[in-house]
Amino acid sequence: MAAPKGKLWVQAQLGLPPLLLLTMALAGGSGTAAAEAFDSVLGDTASCHRACQLTYPLHTYPKEEELYACQRGCRLFSICQFVDDGLDLNRTKLECESACTEAYSQPDEQYACHLGCQDQLPFAELRQEQLMSLMPRMHLLFPLTLVRSFWSDMMDSAQSFITSSWTFYLQADDGKIVIFQSKPEIQYAPQLEQEPTNLRESSLSKMSYLQMRNSQAHRNYLEEEESDGFLRCLSLNSGWILTTTLVLSVMVLLWICCAAVATAVEQYVPPEKLSIYGDLEFMNEQKLSRYPAPSLVIVRSQTEEHEEAGPLPTKVNLAHSEI
């Protein structure tokens, strides 16, 4: 038949390895035994094959060529999807239909092969969705948990360097100062031991006395525990208090430095310029010339041509005059 030959040519056009081509050719002639080895790689086509068997039953279609063409269409779709890495299933369907057109010359076989490509499409979409759901995804709260774990590790490492200790300074008779340093010891109050009493042998007065003593001791224990609770909490959580104080101090110092460096625009005072530059700017604003052009004024008077000058004043001898 011409169908296996056409199928080999289509698979060669898809660029598959020679071993895979040989296996597919054997699968076309000897059944589905050899093709089952590639189901994990090419995808399962059993559902598509069952759809082809329901579409082309042997009691209705006595010829097996159309059934085989439909099943080969399912296989061609899987091969095209494997070659294209399953990026676009619509493109894979078009390639499968073109391969069916080139592989089969009879219109009935071509239609059956196209039907196999169409039947394999929903199963391929379902398998792709299942693969996408199996991919690991980052949760939205993962950055917060990562920051929290990093902060807790940093606080634990910082707390390990901080040690609390008690220091006592004593002055001896000879004037020397003796220093005692030790770690604080945690003392737990002893638990109250209940005395075993026999209800048959003990009297009512003894029971009331024991209950009164136990209640009074329990009350004294609670009062001591409340008075020492705050100091004990400070001694146990001194590392956290010091760490928090250190972090807050660093943040306050950074804020003070940033506030001192950054000055607001409206609070910025420009430096005072020299007076000569101020006068120059004033002249430029008033559009005055720096050196005005000198002006020469000439005054002319009209005199008569024949006018003579008057007589000179008489000379007076100052020695003969009386003042």
Curated annotation (Swiss-Prot):
The ATG16L1-binding motif mediates interaction with ATG16L1 and promotes autophagy. It comes from Mus musculus. Residues 36-238 are extracellular. A motif (ATG16L1-binding motif) lies at residues 263-281. The keyword Cell inner membrane does not apply. GO terms for molecular function: endopeptidase activity. Residues 1-35 form the signal peptide. One of its GO terms (cellular component) is Golgi medial cisterna. The keyword Disulfide bond does not apply. This is Transmembrane protein 59.
